[in-house]
Amino acid sequence: FADKPWAKRVPSIEQWRTLFRTHNGIEPPPPLICDFVYCHEEADVAADRGSRYIASYLESVLEHYEVMGDHFRDTAGYEAYANAAETLQRIGAGGFLRGFLDATAHGTPEQVLGAYRTRWELVGGFEAAPSFRFGGIPYDEAEASLRLFAAEVLPELRRWEVEGAA
């Protein structure tokens, strides 16, 4: 998931690649990166709506899973969640939202492609798994975002595939 700076994701992706090679004896496929995408022709609209809907989604996750609570601390097998909770308590929901927004691909088609290009430069080739309906986005807005992505972003991503990128 696109949920924190991509430079911080690189070690876990490299660990996955190493483990894949070790256990399968072949090169790993490109990682599948899930993302919340909001694409709009106008940068200010994309920034406003993208951040609003992503914030709505994150608020629901924080509330539903009680991610910022202390209940993971003494639960065996949930140490990673406990560590995440400590970080979230330190940076707060606002800090988490800023990091999440910075990691996601939302904006104009050019901005979305720029976000994907930055990822490619850090992690290498990947498969994109965008989600267009989240955080209460009305269906018509989600469809418009998806169609714009399909018309202007996807053809470029397909060229990257031919070139060995995404």
Question: For each of these PLM feature ranges, what is it?
Answer:
Residues 1-2, 35:
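Glycine- and other small-residue-rich loops at beta-strand/loop junctions that grip anionic moieties
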Residues 3-6, 130-142:
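Glycine-rich, proline-tolerant flexible connector loops at the mouths of alpha/beta enzymes
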Residues 11-16, 138-158:
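C-terminal helical cap(s) of enzyme catalytic domains, especially alpha/beta-barrels
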Residues 65-67, 131-132, 147:
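Short, charged/polar low-complexity linear motifs in solvent-exposed/disordered segments
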Residues 7-125, 158-166:
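An alpha-helical appendage that flanks or caps ligand/catalytic pockets
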